[in-house]
């Protein structure tokens, strides 16, 4: 089972990907984690990625696809895997399909977690976390007992600098521009499924599992 999980920033992709990974026994593959692991391991493609990052260049699609190819060759991917946040562009989707086609493989399903922009802005801008223990909080959904103080360890709660409304709206605009062609691409292949990400997290997971079987 080879799954692509899509959704805008703050839609809860990472959380749902972890739960799916645990339930189905397939690894969650995020490009950031794979990139860091490849650089740390000093693999050929990892060294190319490191050189690009150190020179201030973008890590190319070719390098990212090389990292995904190496990672999906590992034994824990034999029964499948879940790609979290990749591909992000049509070129990446086409590159991924071409890479898999060389192995006589293909993506089985693409799930898009749909969330409306303004509720998502409220969801993201309300987030904070403890500087000391990392516990997460939210102004509306999980407020701390005392403002800006962690319930667990009494550490100070901080917000990410990029979790302000203007930055979030810009990130969402970029996401929609990049991924709109992807929706059509995967829909035309009959691979696209959609889940309402505005629901309670347990219900979102239930709907995801209903698709995955």
Swiss-Prot record:
Transmembrane segments: none
Catalytic activity of the protein: AMP + ATP = 2 ADP
GO annotation terms (biological process): AMP salvage
Location(s), subcellular: Cytoplasm
Residues annotated for Zn(2+) binding in this entry: 130, 133, 150, 153
InterPro entries tied to this protein: Adenyl_kin_sub (IPR006259), Adenylat/UMP-CMP_kin (IPR000850), Adenylat_kinase_CS (IPR033690), Adenylate_kinase_lid-dom (IPR007862), P-loop_NTPase (IPR027417)
Coiled-coil features, chain-numbered ranges: none
Residues annotated to bind AMP: 31, 36, 57-59, 85-88, 92, 160, 171
EC number from the UniProt entry: 2.7.4.3
Gene Ontology molecular functions: adenylate kinase activity; ATP binding; zinc ion binding
Any Pfam family matching the protein: ADK_lid
Annotated region (LID), positions in chain: 126-163
Keyword Metal-binding: yes
Top-level taxon: Bacteria
GO cellular component term, pick one: cytoplasm
NCBIfam families assigned to the protein according to its UniProt record, in alphabetical order: adk (TIGR01351), PRK00279.1-2 (NF001380), PRK00279.1-3 (NF001381), PRK14527.1 (NF011100), PRK14532.1 (NF011105)
Family: Belongs to the adenylate kinase family.
Domain notes: Consists of three domains, a large central CORE domain and two small peripheral domains, NMPbind and LID, which undergo movements during catalysis. The LID domain closes over the site of phosphoryl transfer upon ATP binding. Assembling and dissambling the active center during each catalytic cycle provides an effective means to prevent ATP hydrolysis. Some bacteria have evolved a zinc-coordinating structure that stabilizes the LID domain.
HAMAP family in the record: Adenylate_kinase_Adk (MF_00235)
Task performed by this protein: Catalyzes the reversible transfer of the terminal phosphate group between ATP and AMP. Plays an important role in cellular energy homeostasis and in adenine nucleotide metabolism.
Protein name, UniProt field: Adenylate kinase
Organism: Magnetococcus marinus (strain ATCC BAA-1437 / JCM 17883 / MC-1)
């Amino acid at each position: 089972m080879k799954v692509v999980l899509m959704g805008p920033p703050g839609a809860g992709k990472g959380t749902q990907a972890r739960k799916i990974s645990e339930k189905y026994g397939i690894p969650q593959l995020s490009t950031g984690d794979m990139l860091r692991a490849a650089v740390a391991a000093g693999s050929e493609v990892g060294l190319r990625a490191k050189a690009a990052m150190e020179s201030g260049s973008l890590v190319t699609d070719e390098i990212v696809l090389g990292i995904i190819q190496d990672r999906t060759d590992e034994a824990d991917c034999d029964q499948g895997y879940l790609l979290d946040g990749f591909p992000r562009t049509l070129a990446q989707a086409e590159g991924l399909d071409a890479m898999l086609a060389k192995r006589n493989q293909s993506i089985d399903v693409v799930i898009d977690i749909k969330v409306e922009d303004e509720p998502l802005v409220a969801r993201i801008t309300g987030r904070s976390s403890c500087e000391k223990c990392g516990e997460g909080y939210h102004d509306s959904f999980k407020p701390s007992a005392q403002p800006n103080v962690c319930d667990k360890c009494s550490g100070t709660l901080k917000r990410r600098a990029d979790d302000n409304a203007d930055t979030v709206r810009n990130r969402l605009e970029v996401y929609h521009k990049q991924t709109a062609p992807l929706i059509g691409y995967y829909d035309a292949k009959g691979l696209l499924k959609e889940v309402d990400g505005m629901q309670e997290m347990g219900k979102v997971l239930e709907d995801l599992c209903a698709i995955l079987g």
